[in-house]
């Protein structure tokens, strides 16, 4: 794999030396599709060649070993055990996997914030059509203080309880898609524990972007992320 030389300055020189962008292309929207260095591209192609050389051997024996090594590599970034790490196609798939495998009862509510990613909101809407579940949106309008966000959430929970509802789960982000602000997810997890509410974190812009080495200690019920955005992994099929 290509070795990163300290002599290459950060910025345009590094982009041209280590990434696959066209010379006249300046990427301003890394968050949507991500990218990966040339060294990752080269290793990916080596694996493709290995798989094509001995398909049966690769899928039965080589792939499971590589998968376990990849899980072992990600686990320390989150300070969790390898047994808690599972790969999914993307964060939205992870959200769907969690939400569609919970058991709901009449009166259950899912709380989310107005900054929720669109696909996740549509998933909740879909559930509301097929399950005994309601969704409640907590409106926030940035700039907003973290303490005010937590206070709005608690007030919403109390209002729902007084109305005879049960808040089953709260869904929130690590870093918001719009605006690109860091969400107080640690405080939200702690609040959910106090309120006996399941916490689901959409960390699509989490791993590789912000420090998550305390995730194991914070211990949300569910956390899902994307490695292809900020961890420089190959993931999104742009074809």
Predicted regions and their residues:
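Pyridoxal 5′-phosphate
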Residues: 1-239
């Amino acid at each position: 794999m290509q070795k990163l030389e300290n002599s290459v300055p950060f910025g345009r020189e590094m982009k041209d030396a280590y990434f696959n962008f066209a010379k006249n292309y300046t990427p301003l929207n890394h968050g949507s599709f991500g990218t990966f260095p040339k060294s990752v591209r080269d290793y990916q192609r080596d694996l493709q060649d290995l798989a094509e050389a001995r398909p049966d051997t690769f899928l039965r024996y080589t792939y499971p070993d590589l998968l376990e090594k990849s899980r072992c590599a990600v686990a320390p970034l989150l300070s969790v055990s390898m047994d808690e790490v599972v790969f999914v196609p993307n964060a939205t798939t992870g959200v769907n996997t969690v939400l569609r495998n919970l058991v709901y009862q009449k009166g259950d509510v899912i709380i989310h914030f107005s900054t929720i990613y669109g696909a996740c909101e549509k998933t909740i809407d879909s559930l509301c059509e097929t399950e005994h579940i309601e969704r409640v949106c907590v409106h926030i309008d940035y700039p907003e203080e973290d303490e005010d966000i937590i206070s709005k959430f608690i007030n919403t929970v109390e209002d729902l309880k007084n109305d005879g509802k049960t808040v089953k789960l709260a869904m929130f982000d690590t870093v918001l898609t719009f605006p690109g602000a860091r969400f107080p997810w640690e405080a939200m997890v702690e609040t959910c524990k106090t309120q006996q509410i399941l916490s689901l974190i959409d960390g699509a812009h989490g791993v590789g972007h912000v420090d998550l080495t305390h995730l194991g200690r914070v211990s949300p019920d569910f956390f899902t992320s994307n490695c292809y955005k900020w961890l420089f992994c190959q993931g999104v099929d742009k074809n």
